[in-house]
Amino acid sequence: MSPSMSIEALDQPVKPVVFRPLTLRRRIKNSVATTFFFTSFVVALIPLVWLLWVVIARGWFAVTRSGWWTHSLRGVLPEQFAGGVYHALYGTLVQAGVAAVLAVPLGLMTAVYLVEYGTGRMSRVTTFTVDVLAGVPSIVAALFVFSLWIATLGFQQSAFAVALALVLLMLPVVVRAGEEMLRLVPDELREASYALGVPKWKTIVRIVAPIAMPGIVSGILLSIARVVGETAPVLVLVGYSHSINLDVFHGNMASLPLLIYTELTNPEHAGFLRVWGAALTLIIVVATINLAAAMIRFVATRRRRLPL
């Protein structure tokens, strides 16, 4: 073909591509697949909606009652529906907070090691250990802390022992969240910092960590939400109390899961109301933490999209 002919061919308008309509067989397959996935979604959604409806319907009266959030059960008889869950809510937040104080620094340092320094056998062993720890049941973590902290070292049951068990459950979540966020930081930023003569540790602290911090904070909040409802550690490692205990290292301390378990043995109607009220309170706490994590992710995403 001559050059002139090729130029003329290029000057011709491009004909629109004509798509053939889907055959009946393909339309049927698409309809079947759409119906299957929608049905699966509805089937998975029904238990969740039903659970929330039952808990809200049965616990709403308790959580909206005066004094529920500001009073404890000190001096309240089993047949009386009085007081509130202030002592249990305080214990839940304190135990999760102490666990976070211990687990977050250790988890973040482990994540930094795996992403920035980890090579060879040590890195593989650490990754394998974190994976195994992520699948450990809460009762196993509680029994381990009981055998080491209480039976072997001689410390008494306390909220701090519960926090140690929660650390074992939080640690793999924090490590994975930190590792994923650190890997999302572009290597070009690290290389540019190294080219300017900045040491590696200062590059991590001044450049890598601030960029990954919103995602890391979100992962930390999700790890806290994962452990606030754990029941096995509080059943094994601490006793129940009807009043507030400010000492983390000594004495019994109530929590929302422990309050639910204790009130289940109360045959009075007041116990029934407290059980469902505590369950709804626990759901509200977990939902609030998850909402905070989602808001942090949303704000961080919007800041990245803003023009410079």
From Swiss-Prot:
Judging by the UniProt lineage, the source's domain of life is Bacteria
Q: Which residues form a coiled coil?
A: none
> GO molecular function terms here?
phosphate transmembrane transporter activity
- What is its induction? 4-fold by phosphate starvation, part of the pstS3-pstC2-pstA1 operon.
Q: Which UniProt keywords apply?
A: Cell membrane, Membrane, Phosphate transport, Transmembrane, Transmembrane helix, Transport
- Membrane topology designation: Multi-pass membrane protein
**Entry keyword annotation includes Transmembrane:** yes
Cite the ABC transmembrane type-1 domain residue spans from the record. 89-297
Q: Does the keyword Chloroplast apply?
A: no
Q: Which residues cross the membrane?
A: 36-56, 96-116, 132-152, 155-175, 204-224, 276-296
User: Where does the record say this protein resides?
Assistant: Cell membrane
Q: What is its main location?
A: membrane
Q: Name one GO biological process term.
A: phosphate ion transmembrane transport
- Output the Gene Ontology cellular-component terms: plasma membrane
**What is the annotated role of this protein in its UniProt record?**
Part of the binding-protein-dependent transport system for phosphate; probably responsible for the translocation of the substrate across the membrane.
Into which family does the record put it? Belongs to the binding-protein-dependent transport system permease family. CysTW subfamily.
**Quaternary state and partners of this protein?**
The complex is composed of two ATP-binding proteins (PstB), two transmembrane proteins (PstC and PstA) and a solute-binding protein (PstS).
Report the protein name in the record. Answer: Phosphate transport system permease protein PstA 1
Specify the species.
Mycobacterium tuberculosis (strain ATCC 25618 / H37Rv)
Gene name on record? pstA1
